[in-house]
C-alpha cells in the first residue's frame, strides 16, 4: 500500500504532465502559488479521468477546438520537410542561397501574391460579372409554384357543399328586420299650466347682493373668524380674589414732628 504522501506526489506529477501537454513549457516559468496551482491541478486531474459527464464534455469541446486550431498542422509540417530537403539538395549541388535575398513566407497553394494588384480571375475564376449574359427581364417574371392537391380535395371538388365544409367561411351579418310601428302609451311629465305656458321663455332674475370692501370690518370678520371668539384662557391672578386692584400707599411710617400735649 502506498502512503498518502506518495499518492499526493503522484497526483501532482500527473497534473503537471497534463498542464505541460495542454499549455506547453510555459507552466514552469510562472509560479502562481499553492492557492491557485493546487486547485487547478486537481481540477485538471478530474477532467482527465473521464469518469463524469463534465470531463467528457470538456474532452469533446477540446477536440472540437483542436479541429479548428490544428487544421493546417499537417500542411506546415510537410512544407517544413520539403524546405529542409530543398536546402540539403541545394548544398549538395553547390547552389547556395544568397545572404541578402529574403525568402517569401510559406503560403498554401493557389494563393494570390499580395504584392501584385488584385485580379478578378485570380480571386474568383470563372466569374465574368453580375450576370451580364442574362437579360434583366428574366428577373421580373414571377414563377407561380405548383401546389399539391390531395386526393381528398380531388374527390370533393365536384361537390360545392363539401368544399364549403372543408374551407369554412366567416358568417355575414344579417340585415336588420323592420320593427313594427307601435303606439307609445308612456306618460309624459306635463308642465305646470300646460304646454302653452311652458313654451314661453322663463326669465330668471339674478338676486341683488352687496359687494363688501376689503377694509370693511365685516369682511375682516369673514377673513379671520377667530378674531371675535371669546377667549377662555386662564389669566394669572394674585393672592386677592375677584381681581381687586391692590393700592400700595407710599406714606412714611416715621413721623419727625412730635405733637404737643395739653400740659405743654
UniProtKB/Swiss-Prot annotation:
Residues carrying Omega-N-methylarginine: 53
Keywords of this entry: Cytoplasm, Methylation, Phosphoprotein
The keyword Cytoplasm is annotated on this UniProt entry: yes
Pfam families membership: Calsarcin
Ranges where the record places region Disordered: 90-135
CC annotations in GO: actin cytoskeleton; Z disc
A GO term for molecular function: FATZ binding
Localization terms from the record: Cytoplasm, Myofibril, Sarcomere, Z line
Function: Myozenins may serve as intracellular binding proteins involved in linking Z line proteins such as alpha-actinin, gamma-filamin, TCAP/telethonin, LDB3/ZASP and localizing calcineurin signaling to the sarcomere. Plays an important role in the modulation of calcineurin signaling. May play a role in myofibrillogenesis.
Protein name per the record: Myozenin-2
Species assigned in the record: Pongo abelii (Sumatran orangutan)
